[in-house]
Amino acid sequence: MRVFIDEIARHVDQEVELRGWLYQRRSKGKIHFLILRDGTGFLQATVVQGEVPEAVFREADHLPQETALRVWGRVREDRRAPGGFELAVRDLQVVSRPQGEYPIGPKEHGIDFLMDHRHLWLRHRRPFAVMRIRDELERAIHEFFGERGFLRFDAPILTPSAVEGTTELFEVELFDGEKAYLSQSGQLYAEAGALAFAKVYTFGPTFRAERSKTRRHLLEFWMVEPEVAFMTHEENMALQEELVSFLVARVLERRSRELEMLGRDPKALEPAAEGHYPRLTYKEAVALVNRIAQEDPEVPPLPYGEDFGAPHEAALSRRFDRPVFVERYPARIKAFYMEPDPEDPELVLNDDLLAPEGYGEIIGGSQRIHDLELLRRKIQEFGLPEEVYDWYLDLRRFGSVPHSGFGLGLERTVAWICGLAHVREAIPFPRMYTRMRP
């Protein structure tokens, strides 16, 4: 009976067949210890001289890393074994042998070497754990919104304009010289969806042509972007907190083994799963950052009216044991579509959610302008071509209502939950300013 490693605990004292690859091998006297991987996990298999045919024992002594195998044996519970279970091998069959020396040996390798061999590095424990947690988060995102009646709404990748009105766009030449751009966000289209279906979410790749080499930036990354008709700024933040606490709780519940493989202390994530996220206004956050800057020379001062940089977000988020909201930024440093604060029109009803431990922003959200004339004026003030946004203005001409939404960056969220130093490890094949291969 063929089984997978992630279900091995259900087959103790049973004869099973595993199909996978040799990850590591060592020998001690009359025992060969084989660490097998099958894509669902890692398992120790023991080949004992006298308990298998002599030809099998000799074969096991010469298997190179990444040999593809079929292995038959009995599952045993053994606390000494990695994972608490092992396979007592009865027989094995080589399916294929590596053609040459496998590049990623047991010695230490630098990150550039590992990224050059990302197609092979994905087979190792650390990327295995990260990708399993990423998969868990993606599944949980769909479950969260599905259970709350949201419609999955697919936004286009090719767009005629930028959402934020920036120049950080990847340009694509279409037929007859017409130009389009790879999407920076599905937000504008999600707004159309919200006014048709009340509550929607998009989930897909987005692209930013930023010449940035920081640990938080990729050229291609994934975002989930919900949008809800009649939702206020306060309700928007409540939904963000509900989502993030749900995601963290799900990983703690189902992926504790992978967190352990990464050396990630689950206790560091427990406050985020509880909710009760602190809230600071932009003004309060600037004041706190400047107090920190007086104590820490590595944190630059932040003049009021400027946006937070990575050092400011990191310093601020380290002061909290769970994500923290920063809300109501000056309008002049935020996007054209954000609703002004009725108590102070110089501010907007927006928020950023900063992950703790120095990870910084993982969500940006706002209430959207729903007044036609105000939105038209903002488009003009930002110097954007009104004809490109005419369809977007139609959303305000016909049945306009207050509405809100946000975008959660998947890779930044994965990096925080996994405790990664760089978002390049949070996606299977990172696309960066300095890297496009493999």
Swiss-Prot record:
Question: Which EC number applies?
Answer: 6.1.1.22
Catalytically driven reaction(s)? tRNA(Asn) + L-asparagine + ATP = L-asparaginyl-tRNA(Asn) + AMP + diphosphate + H(+)
- Keywords, sorted A to Z: Aminoacyl-tRNA synthetase, ATP-binding, Cytoplasm, Ligase, Nucleotide-binding, Protein biosynthesis
A single GO molecular function term of this UniProt record = asparagine-tRNA ligase activity
Q: InterPro entries in the record, alphabetically?
A: Aa-tRNA-synt_II, aa-tRNA-synth_II, aa-tRNA-synth_II/BPL/LPL, Asn-tRNA-ligase, Asp/Asn-tRNA-synth_IIb, NA-bd_OB-fold, NA-bd_OB_tRNA
Q: What is its main location?
A: cytoplasm
What GO cellular-component annotations does this UniProt entry give? cytoplasm
Where in or outside the cell is it found? Cytoplasm
Alphabetical GO biological process terms: asparaginyl-tRNA aminoacylation
Q: What class of enzyme is it?
A: ligase
What SUPFAM superfamilies does UniProt report for this protein, alphabetically?
Class II aaRS and biotin synthetases, Nucleic acid-binding proteins
Mind telling me which PROSITE patterns this protein's record contains? AA_TRNA_LIGASE_II
What Gene3D superfamilies does this protein's entry cite? Bira Bifunctional Protein, Domain 2 (3.30.930.10), Nucleic acid-binding proteins (2.40.50.140)
Q: Which PANTHER family match?
A: ASPARAGINE--TRNA LIGASE, MITOCHONDRIAL-RELATED, ASPARTYL/LYSYL-TRNA SYNTHETASE
Subunit structure as annotated in this protein's UniProt entry: Homodimer.
Which family would the database say this protein is a member of? Belongs to the class-II aminoacyl-tRNA synthetase family.
In its UniProt entry, what is this protein called?
Asparagine--tRNA ligase
The organism of origin for this protein: Thermus thermophilus (strain ATCC 27634 / DSM 579 / HB8)
Q: What is the lineage of its organism?
A: Bacteria, Thermotogati, Deinococcota, Deinococci, Thermales
Gene that specifies this protein: asnS
